[in-house]
Amino acid sequence: MTPAIWDPVPIPPQAPVREGVADLGGTKLYFWDTGGTGHPVVLLHAATQSAMGWVYQQPALAAAGYRAIGYSRRGYQGSDPGDPAEPGCAADDLHALLDHLGVAQADLVAAAQGGFFALDYALTYPGRVRSLTVVSSLMGITDPDYVAIGNRLRPPFFATLPHDFQELSPSYRAGNPDGLAAWHALEHAAIPGGKRLTPKTRHRLTFAMLETIRHPTLLMTGDSDLYTPPSLLRMQAAHMFGAEMHVIAEAGHSPYFEQPLVFNRLLLDFLGRL
């Protein structure tokens, strides 16, 4: 008998949601909303995912009494295709969506590229944010020393590698073929046009800008993240006031998907202390 090399976590049944496409004037964005009277937690997806990528977090947040909200940015599953020549501003799109949903203040949980836009939103509309959870994100920081670290980490050919190699840990890919297939299916559905659309930020994000943020902040990454390894997470945390940080074992750039039980425990513990 071959010993088990991974203990897979099945994707749980999803909580009931209200789905819709919000007409925000300049664009239309797909969203789902578990509703209820709990504090809103808004999930900002990675560049390879969409609103549908939070399959492990949606039911966990709803079961814990939160109003979980996911949405797809322009160009992603269910939302307007978007125009590469005018991709819009992600902070303004999110602001319009929260107004549409009647959300006065939210906890933002953002993965990877979603972290760029969560930070930009917190800088642009600080009163609308209660807390920030930023996961495995480069944060869009433009400081030259920080950019140089990224260039050392990821040589030019890195962008040509398969997305699962870039984003999922070797341990996960080796041990969980069903999970890998599920991740591929979510990625394939996330970008119907096949090309990612990258919206603008309101601010040129720098460490000096991050140091002005005073929201309670949780930072997480995987120990095998090729974008944001633990040493880079420590660098980020040093520039964020009072930031709490955790490194998740046997996870890469998608710890919320690779190690959902650990991720959800850390997230819910953080939210429960606010």
Descriptions of predicted regions:
Residues 27-80:
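Conserved HGGG/HGGXW glycine-rich cap/lid loop of the alpha/beta-hydrolase fold
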Residues 119-124, 130-159:
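Flexible "cap/lid" loop of the alpha/beta hydrolase fold
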Residues 213, 219-221:
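Short beta-strand/loop motif that positions the catalytic acidic residue
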Residues 89-106:
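Conserved acidic catalytic loop of the alpha/beta-hydrolase fold
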Residues 243-274:
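Catalytic active-site module of serine/aspartate enzymes centered on a nucleophile-bearing elbow/loop
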